[in-house]
Amino acid sequence: MGFTLLIDNYDSFTWNIYADLASVGGNPYVVRNDKITLKEIEGMFSDGELERIVISPGPGHPRTDSGVSRDVIAWGMGKLPILGVCMGLECIVDLLGGEIAYAGEIKHGKTSLVQHDSIGVFHNLPQFLSSTRYHSLSAQIQSLPSVLQVTSTTKESGVIMGVRHRTYTVEAVQYHPESCMSEGGRGLMANFIQMKGGKWGGENAWCGVPAEGEEEQPKAKTNGAPSLPTILNRIHAQRLLDVEQAEKVPATSPANVSTSLSLYASPPLINFRDRMVSTPHTAVMAEIKRASPSKGDIAPTASAPEQALKYALAGASVISVLTEPTWFKGSLLDMLAVRNAVDSLPNRPAILRKDFVLSKYMIDEARLYGADTVLLIVAMLEPQQLKELYDYSVSLGMEPLVEVNNPTELSLALEIGSKVIGVNNRNLHDFNVDMSTTSRVNAALNGRDVVLCALSGISSHEDVEKYVKEGVKGVLVGEALMRASDTKAFLRSLIGLPPLEVVPKSRPLVKICGIRSTDDAKLAISAGADLLGVILVPGTKRCISTSTAREISALVQSARSQSSSKPLEPSLSSPWFTTQSDLLSSRRKPLLVGVFQNQSLSDILSAVEEIGLNLVQLHGDEPQAWAKFIPVPVVKVFRVSPEGIVRGGEIRRPGLNQAILLDAGGVSGGGGEGKAFPWEHAKRLIQSGEVGSEGHMPLPVILAGGLTPENVGQAIEQAGEGVWCVDVSSGVEGEGGKVKEKVEAFVKAVRG
């Protein structure tokens, strides 16, 4: 009969291990870590005497205080079973490249409940074993080598209590199973001494650990406890507590959330699946991810709406917002801010609540805070619960993204009718990534009509191309995007798109304002003006009556009927003002603009209806939000002082007025006073760019104030790219109104 070599790392608990091994027939032979050489151990093995090795607990750090232990482990892996206890576990993890660091808690002579995976050394042992702990160090999940998997953790804090090699018969526990206060210690030792040889499977199949290359099947639950005591279980438990606390707060109680939804306090939805399949390229689900359990902090100070705009303007089809606060450092407020930030885009990305959704309440939360879809993780939900949550989400108009990790989970997802399925390449139990997971699941899909997405570990165009060739329609990318130095360029490179470039604009449009008669209108139209402005501000010198305005409108609409529009499909990547200026530029010309100043909204709406205005210009202190209630595009005037101070509202705010007009700070406010402001201020505003574009997309403006045929060319040149229209009134007038030669000269100076 062979023996068990027990390496003593100078710890009194070694003799407890000796007693347990002896009682179950392990025939232990004890030697201290500096009293034996590797050559001697090799000789024992060659002689057929050595059958297994145990590395004992001990003080200190494995690199400095474990003697021959690390060398023995390196030699013995793949040859014979190895069990590490406390210091023994730390030796194994450290040897294989993991990090041994502060466990987050100091436990000396304290007990904790340990939950485990019920296989290997834990075969047939009950869940929630009371265990004795004497340590302050532990393996760190973030750095755990991919060849190791977590087998057990403490129930209350999730500290790693056990690891196992995926290929070799190497097991380790952090706690002390040999202590008289620990449960199941001799059962654990009995399991260990039954193991044979150096690899799982074969004659070790009895203990349930799959051999290398075998598919690990989902474990049954034991006594109601989760079969895999991993980070996933910790998150599951914490999210249940989080939801319970949220439901107790009056403002976020289930009743109040439901009432808010019934009042349509939530933003409007778009169809998640349609947004995915309508994308002309591979759909990118770009994730906002500050941290993760496997990587720790990634971008802890990242602004969610700022990151979302980068993603959206680069062409993302979906923005995934992690709302889990403890491990991922996200929040529901992040998601609401993201939703608001992209709301003004013409074809905005769908918003995904990326969380561990466990209840209908969490789906209601998602809907209220701006999500278009939610993530349902098959691994976290019982089949009946999965079906109930899927159906409930669909009833709210949100087709869920259903996450799977293997063909068994895929079958469950298909059974409930999932239309969009994501394959997580990351195993949520140990957070290791296997990029072939998507390929295996895709093969099991057998061509079914679902939108398949790959969800983890994607960091290059080659990764994406591999999946696209297999029929994958979308990819979720998080960490790689969060770490990218140029987010937009990197996102586009993933799907083979060129970097974003600003398309040079044609020469600016021309607006002739202060039209007072049909004669003025005729000469402006004849000269080629694109927009004609009529002043409808009582008490100003160019104000005209409603009847005159109607006559001018009839003339303008007649001219428009003889012109043609340019077909325009709004770019997926264009921000608000760029999109609106492109749309206005593409319309039939000329367009009639009614100018108002500090008049009531009802007066403005009446004038639009009675006169037939194509646009409205708000020239006073009107709220920008009025633009939502005016049925035609709105030009909002902002006044620029000689010092460059801008007044009139939030000039770069998207989603309200369709156009920005820069004018000098006048007295009457009716325009046409012939005063200019320094055009370098216009250039500064233009170059500040659209919100979220980081200055790469100029802010389109209408330039007004003191322009003449003589200076308009200089004004355009000094203000720079971004002037999409110039506005003139007094600069083309004489004593009797508009002067034909001046109007023609102005248009010619603009167009060259």
From Swiss-Prot:
Active site residues according to the UniProt entry: 86, 176, 178
Ranges where the record places region N-(5'-phosphoribosyl)anthranilate isomerase: 509-752
Keyword Amino-acid biosynthesis included in the entry's annotation: yes
Source organism, top-level taxon: Eukaryota
Pathway connected to this protein: Amino-acid biosynthesis; L-tryptophan biosynthesis; L-tryptophan from chorismate: step 1/5; Amino-acid biosynthesis; L-tryptophan biosynthesis; L-tryptophan from chorismate: step 3/5; Amino-acid biosynthesis; L-tryptophan biosynthesis; L-tryptophan from chorismate: step 4/5
EC annotation from Swiss-Prot or TrEMBL: 4.1.3.27, 4.1.1.48, 5.3.1.24
Swiss-Prot/TrEMBL catalytic activity: N-(5-phospho-beta-D-ribosyl)anthranilate = 1-(2-carboxyphenylamino)-1-deoxy-D-ribulose 5-phosphate; 1-(2-carboxyphenylamino)-1-deoxy-D-ribulose 5-phosphate + H(+) = (1S,2R)-1-C-(indol-3-yl)glycerol 3-phosphate + CO2 + H2O; chorismate + L-glutamine = anthranilate + pyruvate + L-glutamate + H(+)
GO molecular function, one term: phosphoribosylanthranilate isomerase activity
Residue span(s) of domain Glutamine amidotransferase type-1: 3-202
Region Indole-3-glycerol phosphate synthase, residue ranges: 231-495
Entries under PANTHER family matching the protein: INDOLE-3-GLYCEROL-PHOSPHATE SYNTHASE, TRYPTOPHAN BIOSYNTHESIS PROTEIN
Protein's name in the database: Multifunctional tryptophan biosynthesis protein
Species of the source: Cryptococcus neoformans var. neoformans serotype D (strain B-3501A)
